């Protein structure tokens, strides 16, 4: 390679790196900042599954009463095409009955068990008296001013259409987020109703990471408005230490190192994209997420997070 060619190559690379860094810090130079219809720091996972039975009206009411900024919930569709709030497609874990939501009419759904495991807290259970599986429209009616984050749990066109219709019926486009880790579901949601903001699918999260570490992210337009990701390190507390191999521990460490990046969070935030980290249940986890620049935290313990935020200065 001649010295002239080498100089041109280095100049081009240098220009690219400088431009990438500049746009990473100041994305408004290239992209119009997305309008934020609401801002959520305190997000109650399944309504707060550590303080009330998950995805119940009692859980949602408790979370709203203490001042949560957002309810996170999961949706399935019944045999008679009713949109219900339930995390699992099969109800064995939550009700003790080995049956699929889609195989029963709404009136046939069994009640939740009176005691359920807290999903992201090892060896912890939550008890409650409200064991009824609610309809999504009940949640919309009860909390008309509360932002709601909807996980569309199955790739079902009728479910997606019904949820969209309910959002429009209750005029909640400005207070709703929807999607799933599955990119096909997210694409269908966006196609069905582009007025409802969508979250990043797993495939898109991985793409964003690839673009970030190659310096290309500042140049790429983004349609999603909510970057919702786990904190990989919490996996270590959910399992018995002796059950985690060294290889698994390394993968957890690597995932955490790649995903928990303040520069990434700050860039997305500057573009009007909210960053939510899930599902965190300890104060040191809350602090780490907010110190990294997360917009909000999803928790099973809304009271604990509320107390933390009352004393936390970002």
Swiss-Prot record:
Membrane protein topology class: Multi-pass membrane protein
A single MF term (Gene Ontology): phosphoric diester hydrolase activity
Transmembrane residue ranges: 4-24, 196-216
Entry keyword set: Cytoplasm, Endoplasmic reticulum, Hydrolase, Lipid metabolism, Membrane, Metal-binding, Transmembrane, Transmembrane helix
Annotated Gene Ontology cellular component terms: endoplasmic reticulum; endoplasmic reticulum membrane; membrane; perinuclear region of cytoplasm
Tissue and organ distribution: Widely expressed.
Record-level GO BP terms: N-acylethanolamine metabolic process; phospholipid metabolic process
Record domain GP-PDE: where: 40-309
Catalytically driven reaction(s): 1-hexadecanoyl-sn-glycero-3-phosphocholine + H2O = 1-hexadecanoyl-sn-glycero-3-phosphate + choline + H(+); 1-hexadecanoyl-sn-glycero-3-phosphoethanolamine + H2O = 1-hexadecanoyl-sn-glycero-3-phosphate + ethanolamine + H(+); N-hexadecanoyl-sn-glycero-3-phosphoethanolamine + H2O = N-hexadecanoylethanolamine + sn-glycerol 3-phosphate + H(+); N-(5Z,8Z,11Z,14Z-eicosatetraenoyl)-1-(9Z-octadecenoyl)-sn-glycero-3-phosphoethanolamine + H2O = N-(5Z,8Z,11Z,14Z-eicosatetraenoyl)-ethanolamine + 1-(9Z-octadecenoyl)-sn-glycero-3-phosphate + H(+)
Binding site for a divalent metal cation: 72, 74, 87
Entries under SUPFAM superfamilies matching the protein: PLC-like phosphodiesterases
Activity's dependence on pH: Optimum pH is 7.4.
CDD domains referenced in this protein's UniProt entry, alphabetically: GDPD_GDE4 (cd08612)
Main location as per UniProt: cytoplasm
Subcellular location: Cytoplasm; Membrane; Cytoplasm, Perinuclear region; Endoplasmic reticulum
Cytoplasmic side: 25-195
Gene induction: Up-regulated in white adipose tissue of obese mice.
Function of the molecule: Hydrolyzes lysoglycerophospholipids to produce lysophosphatidic acid (LPA) and the corresponding amines. Shows a preference for 1-O-alkyl-sn-glycero-3-phosphocholine (lyso-PAF), lysophosphatidylethanolamine (lyso-PE) and lysophosphatidylcholine (lyso-PC). May be involved in bioactive N-acylethanolamine biosynthesis from both N-acyl-lysoplasmenylethanolamin (N-acyl-lysoPlsEt) and N-acyl-lysophosphatidylethanolamin (N-acyl-lysoPE). In addition, hydrolyzes glycerophospho-N-acylethanolamine to N-acylethanolamine.
Family: Belongs to the glycerophosphoryl diester phosphodiesterase family.
Protein name as catalogued: Lysophospholipase D GDPD1
UniProt organism field: Mus musculus
